[in-house]
Swiss-Prot record:
The gene is BTLA. It is found in: Cell membrane. Residues 31-157 are extracellular. Phosphorylated on Tyr residues by TNFRSF14 and by antigen receptors cross-linking, both inducing association with PTPN6 and PTPN11. This is B- and T-lymphocyte attenuator.
Length: 289
């Protein structure tokens, strides 16, 4: 069976009309994927210290030919190109990075930056990114993000230390109270001891006075003068140191002997023990009628 030319022409037209939509879609997506795109987030910020090196990246996506990309710094409404700065490319699998180098960062680098790409006579600009440069002198005054993040942990660590002075103060107050209580008890015991000593001294003084009186009475009773009175013949006592001639005749003269007692009686009786006793003196008295 022979195919007619008209049938062949109809088949070709059918395949052409069937493939046109797919070819158009592929072509459209191909154009979209090959457009240059700059991926800088809107209102992005970077905080850096003056004197440190820094790399500002501009993510660029393209197809075959790499576009010409530049950096500029915003000054009011205009953007001044930074052609004298060091730049470089960093290629990765699905995207590339156009890098602006700061070696080192200076205080006047503070501001907003923007990258732009020139592709097929078209200028594509990115969103601006801002650099906040902190001077080294004021860096110690402004805490970093790491320090701000570590502050809660620092507070948790300092909480036990905050209770330590309170504990020390409480212990010191308790110690002072105990010392005062012991001092009061010592004062009370000293006062009671003094009162007891005063009572004992008073009793001792009374006993000393009583013994002194008894000794004086005994000495007075032991000391006497004897004569020839017949009534005194029988008045001699034991331990008497006076000797007389008893029971003499009435008309005869008699001799009486008397002893002189030099004992010391008084509060300083202890001193008398160290004093040597003088020899006893006797006196003879002749009594005549």
């Amino acid at each position: 069976m022979k195919t007619l030319p008209a049938m062949l022409g109809t088949g070709k037209l059918f395949w052409v009309f069937f493939l046109i939509p797919y070819l158009d879609i592929w072509n459209i997506h191909g154009k979209e994927s090959c457009d240059v795109q700059l991926y800088i987030k809107r209102q992005s910020e970077h905080s850096i210290l003056a004197g440190d090196p820094f790399e500002l990246e501009c993510p660029v996506k393209y197809c075959a030919n790499r576009p010409h990309v530049t950096w500029c710094k915003l000054n009011g409404t205009t953007c001044v190109k930074l052609e004298d700065r060091q730049t470089s490319w960093k290629e990765e699998k699905n995207i590339s990075f156009f890098i602006l180098h700061f070696e080192p960062v200076l205080p006047n680098d503070n501001g907003s930056y923007r990258c732009s790409a020139n592709f097929q006579s078209n200028l594509i600009e990115s969103h601006s990114t801002t650099l906040y440069v902190t001077d080294v002198k004021s860096a110690s005054e402004r805490p970093s993000k790491d320090e701000m993040a570590s502050r809660p942990w620092l507070l948790y660590r300092l909480l036990p230390l905050g209770g330590l002075p309170l504990l020390i103060t409480t212990c010191f107050c308790l110690f002072c109270c105990l010392r005062r209580h012991q001092g009061k008890q010592n004062e009370l015991s000293d006062t009671a001891g003094r009162e007891i000593n005063l009572v004992d001294a008073h009793l001792k003084s009374e006993q000393t006075e009583a013994s002194t009186r008894q000794n004086s009475q005994v000495l007075l009773s032991e000391t006497g003068i004897y004569d020839n009175d017949p009534d005194l013949c029988f008045r001699m006592q034991e331990g008497s140191e006076v000797y007389s001639n008893p029971c003499l005749e009435e008309n005869k003269p008699g001799i009486v002997y008397a002893s002189l007692n030099h004992s010391v009686i008084g509060p300083n009786s202890r001193l008398a023990r160290n004093v040597k006793e003088a020899p006893t003196e006797y006196a003879s008295i002749c009594v005549r009628s």
